[in-house]
Each structure stands twice: as structure tokens, then as C-alpha cells.
Amino acid sequence: MPKRILQGVVVSDKNEKTVVVRVERRFAHPLMQKTVRRSKKYKAHDENNQYKVGDVVSIEECAPISKDKRWTVVAAQA
């Protein structure tokens, strides 16, 4: 099974080698058919502490690194 890749915005870089990325998804409400926005935060591994708050990044699924980290940052979007 291929690894999932998500795109989001870094909302916190206070932890050592970890960033918190907010990923937003949009979908049509099943009854109202209005576009709804929902977001979720993922902790992602940042080996060199190179990503800062506000950066748009891609994160990829990986083996568990800690209790909460199962994602790693692969690239920043231009």
C-alpha cells in the first residue's frame, strides 16, 4: 500500500525536531450540499528544525517515531 502524502501549514515549531502541521480538507455536506472545511493537526518529524510557522509543507506517512509522531516532512511548497 502506498504511503499517504498530505499538504498543510506549519502552526507550531516549538518542539525539538517536531513541527505541528494543520491539514485542511473540504467536502460537500451530505444533506445541505454546502462545501464544509475541516482541519486536523498532525505532528511531523523535522530532522534539521528547518521549517518555521507559516511554511506550507508536504508530510508523508512513516513508521512510528514516538507516541504521537507517524509523519515526516518531505518538502516545503514554493
UniProtKB/Swiss-Prot annotation:
Superkingdom of the source species: Bacteria
Keywords: Ribonucleoprotein, Ribosomal protein, RNA-binding, rRNA-binding
Protein's GO biological process: translation
Any one Pfam family match given in the protein's UniProt record, by short name: Ribosomal_S17
GO cellular component, one term: cytosolic small ribosomal subunit
UniProt GO MF annotations: rRNA binding; structural constituent of ribosome
PANTHER family associated with the record: 40S RIBOSOMAL PROTEIN S11 FAMILY MEMBER, SMALL RIBOSOMAL SUBUNIT PROTEIN US17M
Protein name: Small ribosomal subunit protein uS17
Protein source organism: Agrobacterium fabrum (strain C58 / ATCC 33970) (Agrobacterium tumefaciens (strain C58))
